[in-house]
C-alpha cells in the first residue's frame, strides 16, 4: 500500500463510554497534533493491530505531561479492570 495516498472509507458515529481523564488526555493529544479524536483512535488501533507502537518518544513525553496535568494515574495494568461508579453509570446501564 502506498503510504501517502488518501484512502476513502465509510465512517460511522458511535457512542462509547470511556474513563473521564483518559478522554481528556486523548482529546488534548489529538488537538496538539491537529487531529480529530476519531483519527487519533483509528491510528492507535491500526498500529496496535499491526503490533507497532503508535507513538514516538516525543509523543510519549507529551502524553506523560498530559496525564500529569489531568491527574490520570492509570496505566496499561488497569486495562479491563475499570468499573464505573454508580453515579457515572447511565440509568438502565449494564453492570459488567
Residue ranges of predicted features:
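Short Lys/Arg-rich basic patches
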Residues: 1-20, 27-30, 67-77, 84-96
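Extended hydrophobic secondary-structure segments
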Residues: 17-23, 38-41
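Short, basic amphipathic alpha-helical segments that act as recognition/interaction helices
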Residues: 33-60
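Short, charged, surface-exposed hinge/linker loops at domain edges
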Residues: 55-57, 64, 69
